[in-house]
Amino acid sequence: MAKFASIVALLFAALVVFAAFEAPTVVEAKLCERSSGTWSGVCGNNNACKNQCIRLEGAQHGSCNYVFPAHKCICYFPC
C-alpha cells in the first residue's frame, strides 16, 4: 500500500512540474487589411509600403499585394 501511495505521489509531482513548465498560449489578434489611404500609384516597394502604413496610418504592417489590375499598398490593422 505504501508503494502505491508513493507512486501516486510521484505521478502527481511529475504532473505539477510538467504544468509549471507548460508555455502559456498567446492568442494573436486578427488583422484586417485595407488599401492604403496615403499611397499613390503602383506599389513596387514592400519596405516603403510597410513604413508608410506604420508611420502615417498607424497600421501594424503593410505590403504590396496584387489587387486587379495592379499592385496596391495594403495596410494591416487589428480588426
From Swiss-Prot:
Keyword Disulfide bond annotated: yes
Keywords noted in UniProt: Antimicrobial, Disulfide bond, Fungicide, Plant defense, Secreted, Signal
Biological process annotations from GO: defense response to fungus; killing of cells of another organism
UniProt-listed Pfam families: Gamma-thionin (PF00304)
Record's keyword annotation contains Transcription regulation: no
Record-linked SUPFAM superfamilies: Scorpion toxin-like (SSF57095)
One cellular-component annotation, GO: extracellular region
Signal peptide region: 1-29
Function: Possesses antifungal activity sensitive to inorganic cations.
Descriptive protein name: Defensin-like protein 3
Organism lineage: Eukaryota, Viridiplantae, Streptophyta, Embryophyta, Tracheophyta
